[in-house]
Amino acid sequence: MTRYIFITGGVVSSLGKGITAASLGTILQARGLSVSMTKLDPYINVDPGTMSPFQHGEVYVTDDGAETDLDLGHYERFVRTTMTRNNNYTTGRIYESVIRKERRGEYLGGTVQVIPHITDEIKRSIQQGADDADIALIEIGGTVGDIESLPFLEAIRQMGAELGRGRCLFMHLTLVPFIGAAGEMKTKPTQHSVKELRSIGIQPDILVCRASQRIPEEERRKIALFTNVEPRAVVSCLDVDNIYKIPEVLHRQGLDNIVAEKLGLELPPASLQDWQRVVEAMQNPEGEVTIAMVGKYVDLTDAYMSLNESLRHAGIQTRHRVNIRYIDSEELEREGTHALDGVDAVLVPGGFGERGVEGKILAARYARERKVPYLGICLGMQVAVIEYARNVAGLEGAHSTEFTRHPHHPVIGLITEWMTDEGTVEQRSEDSDLGGTMRLGAQPCRLTEGSLARQVYGKDVVEERHRHRYEFNNHYLEALEAAGLRFSGWSHDRKLVEVVEQPDHPWFLACQFHPEFTSTPRDGHPLFAAFVRAAIAHRG
């Protein structure tokens, strides 16, 4: 019998509901429960796949090929579970489903309304995402008071009434600001946020109060009094310098005990030794390296959330602090590659569109010529191929058809047909819709014996997640192989190139897939660990 924990937020956005939910999930998992996690996003987009990274941050890709909110990345990194498209629903997706049902006549000619049709669809989606787990944590995006969130809040209010207090609880995340001029913390924003939530019909059982410093006991009692929440259920969550400390912070305050008691669960004690080891490794590094990340979304580092975390995970594995130097690829186009001087490795991540692509090509050339370790991901592989074709293989004018309609040498082109892991053929053209029309999700990749990729992974076949429309053009395979480029990873049908290497380089590897989506703080990822070790060796 699944029990539900609904997590809402108030006062301001970006309080860290996703990390709080994921931290609670990993504590409950450590106490022997199976845990599922779902994010409900109020925006009307069907998914974030076509949203600008500056608007939304990273698009996180699941094993089954869903383009989802970046919070699902936090869920997978904290909780040992695999997310699917059933773990992220948007207003657009909910309405799309309801409208399809109306067109099929499933509502028997009735008037389709927010209540009950939209709220029923939300409840059905929540139950589907729960997947019969012992505990289902449901995060409601946005802030209480937003008009977009109202259908979701109404749906969870109804579920609370239907399930009863023994099977669900409500946890509300708020901000308790410190006013420097007054020298005191202010509880009024939290009081008003809970008042707004109660006006909808939801009484929170637990308050998690974000604060920059310790909340005095007197203020906690005041919050409890005005919000009708038990004093012990007013939990402080102070700012920390490392998000992987949060599970221990919440556990020390007994959040998991409060949850277990309110849901009528008797559980064994939690062991958080894994997280203690993670934090200890990050706080006591044996050295440090600096890695240049050359992209065009560097003003908003959330656009590279999983990459940032993957490099930190590799730092945990190697016991080195990884300093990331963000470099705007357009800056390299304007001012040259001086910004790369002194780095221990270069990473070029994925991206879309022509802006800044020549700067990424310059970064790949810099790494190749100066023997600096290089890791290219998705577009980072494509620019490495373009650079090699132009400057080593002598294919003047080599480019991708994504950026130039008719290049002299289209070494990268649109994938018009490929086979999915289920054996079905996907076809696309330049006129296809942008949303959901890429090669998406986990796909097997066969690695060549004796290659760097095979050495790094330690096996012949790996499975990694993809998100791209363009691929290497196999017509140029022989020419580039003759020039010294090695193609060391292939799709399972050997039609698509997945990994390229430069054998005469100390460490140069580029992949079409996104390994950052499967890296976790406790287990890391072999590709990032090997990349950071190469950076350490280069640093000397």
UniProtKB/Swiss-Prot annotation:
Q: Which residues bind L-glutamine?
A: 351, 379-382, 402, 469
Cite the entry's keywords alphabetically. Answer: ATP-binding, Glutamine amidotransferase, Ligase, Magnesium, Metal-binding, Nucleotide-binding, Pyrimidine biosynthesis
Q: Where is this region: Amidoligase domain?
A: 1-265
* GO MF term set: ATP binding; CTP synthase activity; glutaminase activity; identical protein binding; metal ion binding
Q: What is its EC number?
A: 6.3.4.2
Q: Binding residues for CTP, per the UniProt record?
A: 13, 146-148, 186-191, 222
Q: Where does Mg(2+) bind?
A: 71, 139
Q: What class of enzyme is it?
A: ligase
Q: How is activity regulated here?
A: Allosterically activated by GTP, when glutamine is the substrate; GTP has no effect on the reaction when ammonia is the substrate. The allosteric effector GTP functions by stabilizing the protein conformation that binds the tetrahedral intermediate(s) formed during glutamine hydrolysis. Inhibited by the product CTP, via allosteric rather than competitive inhibition.
PROSITE patterns recorded? GATASE_TYPE_1
Q: Which GO terms describe its cellular component?
A: cytosol
Q: Which terms does the UniProt entry file under GO BP?
A: 'de novo' CTP biosynthetic process; pyrimidine nucleobase biosynthetic process
**What positions constitute the catalytic site?**
378 (nucleophile), 514, 516
What SUPFAM superfamilies would the database entry show? Class I glutamine amidotransferase-like, P-loop containing nucleoside triphosphate hydrolases
Q: Where is the Glutamine amidotransferase type-1 domain?
A: 290-540
User: Which pathway is this protein assigned to?
Assistant: Pyrimidine metabolism; CTP biosynthesis via de novo pathway; CTP from UDP: step 2/2
Subunit description = Homotetramer.
UniProt lists the family membership as follows: Belongs to the CTP synthase family.
Q: Tell me the PANTHER family matching this sequence.
A: CTP SYNTHASE, CTP SYNTHASE-RELATED
Q: What does this protein do?
A: Catalyzes the ATP-dependent amination of UTP to CTP with either L-glutamine or ammonia as the source of nitrogen. Regulates intracellular CTP levels through interactions with the four ribonucleotide triphosphates.
What else does the entry mention about this protein? Answer: CTPSs have evolved a hybrid strategy for distinguishing between UTP and CTP. The overlapping regions of the product feedback inhibitory and substrate sites recognize a common feature in both compounds, the triphosphate moiety. To differentiate isosteric substrate and product pyrimidine rings, an additional pocket far from the expected kinase/ligase catalytic site, specifically recognizes the cytosine and ribose portions of the product inhibitor.
Name the UniProt record assigns to this protein = CTP synthase
Could you tell me which species this protein originates from? Alkalilimnicola ehrlichii (strain ATCC BAA-1101 / DSM 17681 / MLHE-1)
